[in-house]
């Protein structure tokens, strides 16, 4: 069993019977007292943030995981169907595992699935940057392009994000899936 000194950001551990991913960890040594670790963790089932203090040297259960790339095929109701490129096995992933990033999923996109050693899927990660086509946005005039500002644009996946005034229908843009923000125009 691991101890608190093995904890680091991104580690998945079992806490109070649920799987959590460690978001932040810091060590504190107040005055002449024993040191402790202050941890901020995200529950992988419901997404809630949990904070806890661990004593230095306390035993914790770190979960062994395996990360595998899968190809996104299509949406089936509330589930997303992914295919393993090696075995061609198709998996149905629930909407809760992908979360807000689902709006950036495009057919044939590679998605990282995180499995426990028991074969349970605990996390699905969309690539950090994706390139999508703008399918609908307001036309701009020459005066609008001179001004700085943003306008809403609908992507090919249905996601609506704010883009600069110079972006037109048919443009390909790069988006940060963590924040849902425009990064730059893609070179296509």
UniProtKB/Swiss-Prot annotation:
GO BP of this protein: peptide biosynthetic process
A Gene Ontology term for the protein's cellular component: cytoplasm
Cross-referenced PROSITE patterns: EFP
Subcellular localization: Cytoplasm
Listed pathway(s): Protein biosynthesis; polypeptide chain elongation
Segments passing through the bilayer: none
InterPro entries: Elong-fact-P_C (IPR015365), NA-bd_OB-fold (IPR012340), Rib_uL2_dom2 (IPR014722), Transl_elong_fac_P/YeiP (IPR020599), Transl_elong_KOW-like (IPR013185), Transl_elong_P/YeiP_cen (IPR001059), Transl_elong_P/YeiP_CS (IPR013852), Transl_elongation_fac_P (IPR011768)
One MF term in the entry's GO annotations: translation elongation factor activity
Keyword Protein biosynthesis: yes
Keyword entries, A-Z: Cytoplasm, Elongation factor, Protein biosynthesis
Main location class: cytoplasm
SUPFAM superfamilies tied to this protein: Nucleic acid-binding proteins (SSF50249), Translation proteins SH3-like domain (SSF50104)
PANTHER family given in the database record: ELONGATION FACTOR P, ELONGATION FACTOR P (EF-P) FAMILY PROTEIN
Function per UniProt: Involved in peptide bond synthesis. Stimulates efficient translation and peptide-bond synthesis on native or reconstituted 70S ribosomes in vitro. Probably functions indirectly by altering the affinity of the ribosome for aminoacyl-tRNA, thus increasing their reactivity as acceptors for peptidyl transferase.
Family to which this protein belongs: Belongs to the elongation factor P family.
Protein name, per record: Elongation factor P
Protein's organism: Chloroherpeton thalassium (strain ATCC 35110 / GB-78)
Lineage: Bacteria, Pseudomonadati, Chlorobiota, Chlorobiia, Chlorobiales
Gene that produces this protein: efp
